[in-house]
Curated annotation (Swiss-Prot):
Protein name per the record: Solute carrier family 52, riboflavin transporter, member 2
Extent of Acidic residues compositional bias: 240-250
Activity control, per UniProt: Riboflavin transport is Na(+)-independent but moderately pH-sensitive. Activity is strongly inhibited by riboflavin analogs, such as lumiflavin. Weakly inhibited by flavin adenine dinucleotide (FAD) and flavin mononucleotide (FMN).
Compartments, as annotated in UniProt: Cell membrane
Gene Ontology cellular component annotations, sorted alphabetically: plasma membrane
Region annotated Disordered, chain positions: 228-267
One Pfam family linked to the record: SLC52_ribofla_tr
Family the entry assigns: Belongs to the riboflavin transporter family.
């Protein structure tokens, strides 16, 4: 087999990155657009709690993929990937005209269209990792780096789009008679939510087109559609050299440095027991951090930020979402292998999380409300909290890599179960019992 040309390799890396861009762009886009839509939908400040539960329920898509593999063994990942991409494109395209439509449910108005389409997109995104990655397993390992780079773009690009859009502005005009606040004056964003969702749809169409391009670019690979073993790039080609380098870089993640040199040790029951305790601790850490970042804290983000204004909420959501891929890139260069270090970072993240939870409990009158210092503190706390927890999750997952596929599977289960438990725990206090309080525009509940 002839060595692929440099142009062929570059194009393949580009298409793989664009494929990764579409993996979580839909759900990330919904999250960063919350500061814009929350003021229009009937759930109000409780909308993030509803969305947390909806995204957690998206893991039901994994059952569908499992059923597909049982009923159609050996069919590969082409059809599931195309179904995921169609659901993502159609879901975001329908969000553009329908996101603001409401309907009565149990005697109360709810944003049925928004939440239903969010569930469809969550099903697609949660299924993407278990369909996209097996497809890429038929390509040489260097292409995985391009895929994860694309996954980072799936968070960064919606954030950039949201920053360009802005969040609008609210002014309270004084009434001429008694000097009290009059009706609020709303200044809109640079473009509406519908335009944002159309732009998000364009990103997903680009990702879907990239997958079709990969199928056309690699027509000689039967493994692309059949699920068989894929061919390797020829030795001596740029891709093969990069693959060897990739394997060398991945080696520290697979075994401790103390065992890298010397003979391979035989089975040791005590070492196995130690690894089990070590692995169980890492899995517990993954479950706790996922419960906090994917369930508990997002459910109260609006209550902790909106008392300081729409801009504070907007910046906390957008910059917090951007902190996630940045932490992942940091972990690729500097990986903490110490359990004590991971515990210390987790405690630091919990400290920020506790501060944010206190702000939410004290809503609508948290400390420093109405001051610039309050805005800076709440935004910085959200960014640092999510950045620290994201780094801990990546580091813990990397340390579990040495356990092979069973360990990574257990890590995925821990992350999803933690997210589901966190979202389910916070839904009753935020959306049913209304433990956290919101406030109306241009009404000061914190005055004397």
């Amino acid at each position: 087999m002839a060595a692929p040309t440099l142009g062929h390799l570059v194009l393949t890396h580009l298409l793989v990155a664009l494929l990764g861009m579409g993996s979580w762009a839909a759900v990330n886009g919904i999250w960063v657009e919350l500061p814009v839509v929350v003021k229009h939908l009937p759930e109000g400040w409780s909308l993030p709690s509803y969305l947390s539960v909806v995204v957690a329920l998206g893991n039901l898509g994994l059952l569908v993929v499992t059923l597909w593999r049982r009923l159609a063994p050996g069919k590969g990942e082409r059809v599931p990937i195309q179904v995921v991409q169609v659901l993502s494109v159609v879901g975001t395209a329908l969000l553009a005209p329908l996101w603001h439509h409401v309907a009565p449910v149990a005697g109360q108005l709810h944003s049925v269209a928004f939440l239903t389409l969010a569930l469809v997109l969550a099903l697609a995104c949660c299924t993407s990792n278990v369909t996209f990655l097996p497809f890429l397993s038929h390509l040489p390992p260097p292409f995985l780096r391009s895929f994860f780079l694309g996954q980072g773009l799936s968070a960064l690009l919606p954030c950039v789009l949201a920053l360009v859009q802005g969040v609008g502005r609210l002014e309270c005009s004084p009434a001429p008679t008694n000097g009290t606040s009059g009706p609020p004056l709303n200044f809109p964003e640079r473009f509406p939510a519908s335009t944002f969702y159309w732009a998000l749809t364009a990103l997903l169409v680009t990702s879907a087109a990239a997958f079709q391009g990969l199928l056309l670019l690699l027509p000689s690979l039967p493994s692309v559609t059949t699920g068989g073993a894929g061919p390797e790039l020829p030795l001596g080609s740029p891709g093969a050299e990069e693959e060897e380098k990739e394997e060398e870089e991945a080696l520290p993640l697979q075994e401790p440095p103390s065992q890298a040199a010397g003979t391979i040790p035989g089975p040791d029951p005590e070492a196995h027991q130690l690894f089990s305790a070590h692995g169980a601790f890492l899995l517990g850490l993954l479950a706790i951090t996922s419960a906090l970042t994917n369930g508990v804290l997002p459910a109260v983000q609006s209550f902790s930020c909106l008392p300081y204004g729409r801009l504070a909420y907007h910046l906390a959501v957008v910059l917090g979402s951007a902190a996630n891929p940045l932490a992942c890139f940091l972990a690729m260069g500097v990986l903490c292998r110490s359990l004590a270090g991971l515990v210390g970072l987790s405690l630091l993240g919990m400290l920020f999380g506790a501060y944010l939870m206190v702000l939410a409990i004290l809503s609508p009158c948290p400390p420093l409300v109405g001051t610039t210092a309050g805005v800076v503190l709440v935004v910085l706390s959200w960014v640092l909290c999510l950045c620290v927890f994201s780094y801990v999750k990546v580091a813990a997952s990397s340390l579990l890599h040495g356990g092979g596929r069973p360990a990574l599977l257990a890590a995925g289960v821990a992350i999803q179960m933690g997210s589901l438990l966190g979202a389910g725990t916070m839904f009753p206090p935020t959306s049913i019992y209304h433990v956290f309080q919101s406030r109306k525009d241009c009404v000061d509940p914190c005055g004397p």
